Design a protein with these regions (language model features):
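Conserved beta-strand positions in repeat-built beta-propeller and related beta-rich domains
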Residues: 12-14, 19-25, 62-68, 108-116
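Structural signal for beta-propeller blades
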Residues: 27-29, 70-72, 115-116, 126
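Beta-rich, blade/repeat-based domains predominating
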Residues: 1-18, 45-65, 91-103
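Beta-propeller blade signature
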Residues: 122-135
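Anionic-ligand binding region
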Residues: 8-10, 25-51
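A short beta-strand motif characteristic of beta-propeller blades
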Residues: 1-2, 38-45, 83-89
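Ser/Thr-rich, Proline-interspersed low-complexity disordered segments
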Residues: 138-151
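Short loop/turn segments that connect beta-strands within beta-propeller blades
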Residues: 33-38, 74-80, 130-132
Length: 151
């Protein structure tokens, strides 16, 4: 086990058979079989997800909050391999940590890690951004504007 942040962000596959989690300090993605605990590293080819934190899974598409941005990963039907796709950010993001899908939007939680030595600014915020490139192949630039609050 390496020092630093390790397992983070956990989601279940739609059938409940597997859990996916990211190792924050290495960028590795893992698949855990719920029935027997067998764990494999998901083959992302040359891709990785350093700083991975929050995860959201919609079918075979995994959204990963990492290093101030959101990255799309397209996974194989057995969740054993995948392709790291495009990443995006938004001016409304402030140290984003996790996310959830709501309709055609991603709701991204903004942390206040930068306020650890003082009082947090209230209220805490959640950014609402359109899902970029919905229905497009990974790597295709999005025609959807990423204006905060437009969802």
């Amino acid at each position: 086990m390496q020092s630093g942040f390790n397992a983070n962000g956990i989601v279940a596959t739609p059938d409940g058979r597997y859990l996916l989690l990211v190792q924050t300090n290495t960028g590795a993605l893992y698949r855990v079989d719920v029935a027997n605990g067998e764990t494999i590293q998901v083959d992302l080819g040359a891709g990785s997800l350093p700083g991975g934190d929050g995860l959201e899974l919609e079918g075979q598409t995994l959204w990963v909050v990492r290093e101030g941005q959101v990255t799309r990963v397209e996974l194989s039907p057995d969740y054993a391999s995948g392709t790291v796709g495009d990443s995006f950010t938004d001016p409304s993001f402030t140290d984003p940590t996790t996310l959830a899908r709501f309709d055609d939007c991603l709701l991204v939680v903004n942390s206040q890690f930068s306020q650890q030595q003082g009082q947090p600014e209230l209220p805490f915020t959640v950014s609402s951004v359109p899902i970029p490139g919905a229905g497009e192949a990974v790597g295709t630039p999005s025609a959807t504007p990423l204006a905060a609050g437009s969802c």
